[in-house]
């Protein structure tokens, strides 16, 4: 519900009027797509934008910009918590230096991508460079209908920049959407805390938060759908390292993943047929290479 509320706030900033009741199933399909595509938890974002654009008649560049803004707002608290986690694990866990370096590099990469995205949104010259770079790729790999596709690129990037500027400059981002993002991450950690309480274990929320953030970083690596297996293993390993028994760590992790991963996936997959076979095509495209995905997204 909170994910849906945040996206609704962003949509309203862009003049897209849609109720939470209508947005909620789209969000669930997006979450399910994130879980089944090895795209660093980003495979569901184009699907969300596509469904909203198709069903409500808004331009794709506008709906995609609201989805990107929503993802960026989710990234801000994650980066903040990731920095605190890297500092904290030096006290709670004895990790090899290369693991710490890898986590630091991952956070720096996320921050760099976020800065580039925002900079492209507010700087027309940089946006033009991105435009020209994409056009260069089109001319190199796509010979047929390249002029038409180039025009689509111009339209999408211009519309994306206009929408992002509008969203970024709106004070409701700071007053409502950003605080809501922190609340969402707090509830994510509290969910794990409640799972441990259900087993009669009182685990420090700090340890839970650190393990959860580390597992989330692993889950963003686009190797397995939703970080399947890797996230579970990391959570069990680090809970055990923190002094929690292996059996309790495994049981709590399985229950938590049933709630956060499998429940969301099943609900999203049950809702998916409602939106038709074209959405399945989008999900298939999300699993392909970045170049192919970008091309189909523009179409």
Role assignments for model-derived ranges:
Residues 2-10, 48, 188-195, 213-214, ...:
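Hydrophobic/aromatic residues in alpha-helical transmembrane segments
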Residues 3-29, 195-211:
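Membrane-embedded helical hairpins/re-entrant loop segments and their flanking transmembrane helices
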Residues 16-25, 58-60, 95-98, 172-173, ...:
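Membrane-helix interface segments
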Residues 20-25, 100-107, 174-179, 205-210, ...:
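Hydrophobic alpha-helical transmembrane segments
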Residues 21-30, 62, 206-217, 247-258:
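Alpha-helical transmembrane segments of multi-pass membrane proteins
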Residues 33-144, 224, 228-299:
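Transmembrane helix-loop-helix hairpins in multi-pass inner-membrane proteins
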Residues 57, 139-160:
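Short, membrane-interfacial amphipathic segments enriched in basic
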Residues 158-161, 165-214:
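Transmembrane helical segments that form the transport core of multi-pass membrane transport proteins
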């Amino acid at each position: 519900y909170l994910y849906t509320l945040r996206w609704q706030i962003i949509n309203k900033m862009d003049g897209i009027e849609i109720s939470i009741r209508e947005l909620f199933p789209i969000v669930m399909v997006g979450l399910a797509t994130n879980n089944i595509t090895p795209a660093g938890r980003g495979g569901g974002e184009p699907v969300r934008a596509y469904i909203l654009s198709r069903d409500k008649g808004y331009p794709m560049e506008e709906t995609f910009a609201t989805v990107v803004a929503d993802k960026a707002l989710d990234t801000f608290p994650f980066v903040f918590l990731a920095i605190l986690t890297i500092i904290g694990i030096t006290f709670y866990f004895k990790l090899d230096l290369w693991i710490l370096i890898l986590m630091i590099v991952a956070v720096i990469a996320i921050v760099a991508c976020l800065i580039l995205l925002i900079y492209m949104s507010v700087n027309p010259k940089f946006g033009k460079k991105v435009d020209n770079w994409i056009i260069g790729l089109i001319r190199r790999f796509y010979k047929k209908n390249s002029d038409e596709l180039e025009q689509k690129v111009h339209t999408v990037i211009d519309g994306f920049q206009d929408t992002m500027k509008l969203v970024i400059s709106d004070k409701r981002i700071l007053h409502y959407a950003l605080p809501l993002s922190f609340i969402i991450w707090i509830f994510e950690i509290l969910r794990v805390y409640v799972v441990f309480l259900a087993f009669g274990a009182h685990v420090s929320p700090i340890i839970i938060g650190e393990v959860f953030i580390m597992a989330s970083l692993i889950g963003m690596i686009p190797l397995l759908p939703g970080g399947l297996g890797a996230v579970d293993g990391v959570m069990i390993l680090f809970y055990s390292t923190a002094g929690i028994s292996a059996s309790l760590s495994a049981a709590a992790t399985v229950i938590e993943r049933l709630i956060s991963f499998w429940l969301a996936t099943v609900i999203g997959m049950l809702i998916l047929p409602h939106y038709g076979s074209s959405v399945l095509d989008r999900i298939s495209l999300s699993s392909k290479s970045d170049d192919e995905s970008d091309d189909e997204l523009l179409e």
